[in-house]
Regions:
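Short, conserved alpha-helical segments within structured domains
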Residues: 18-22, 44, 116
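Acyl-donor (CoA/ACP) binding surface of acyl/acetyltransferases
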Residues: 1-9, 45, 49-164
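A short helix-loop-beta-strand connector motif used in the catalytic cores of GNAT acetyltransferases and
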Residues: 31-47
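Conserved GNAT-fold acetyl-CoA-binding loop/helix
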Residues: 7-32
Length: 164
């Protein structure tokens, strides 16, 4: 099993090697991201913060929006291993799905999950996502090849789970 994603090991969503960034560069990137979101309504980026101390613990994104088909993809990541398995991901996923299905009126949501991410697989399965595609050996991490799994959830499947 590969080393977990953290601020020191690099993002699980990118193939690029992590590079240290100054506070000024981080601020500049997020200002650009905010401007891009204003200009392009095909993605929404969210920061996940812990309520108790407002600490930044992760990020989430709805992207690849196909308005004509009602499809979108999502990403969700909790950075530090010490912040995982505390319910932050479930809370964020609940809000993301509500936003995608209720606010954006999407028909389906797709998530791309590396096979080594057992926590994410369990979380998305719990929320009713179904594995639809397995891209064999599509990822390389820690000198090993891993499958990339494509999971999907339809609006009516979500509505059945979301209603009491």
């Amino acid at each position: 099993r590969p080393a977990p994603f953290s601020s020191t090991t690099g993002a699980a969503f990118t193939a690029r090697r992590p590079t240290p960034m100054s506070a000024a560069i981080v601020k500049k990137r997020y200002e650009k991201l905010e401007k891009d979101m204003e200009d392009d309504k095909n993605f929404y980026h969210f920061m996940i913060r812990a309520r108790e101390d407002d600490r930044l613990i992760g990020k989430a994104m709805i992207h690849r929006i196909e308005w004509s088909n009602g499809n979108c993809a999502m990403r969700l990541g909790i950075g530090a291993e010490s912040d995982r398995r505390k319910g932050f991901g479930a809370q964020a996923l609940t809000m993301l799905l509500r936003f995608a299905f209720s606010e954006l009126n999407m028909f389906r949501v797709t998530a791309y999950i590396p096979e080594y991410n057992e926590g994410a697989l369990a979380l998305f399965r719990k929320f009713g996502f179904v594995e639809e595609v397995r891209r064999r050996q599509a990822l390389e991490r820690d000198a090993r090849r891993w499958d990339l799994l494509v999971w999907g959830l339809l609006k009516d499947e979500w509505a059945k789970q979301a209603s009491p």
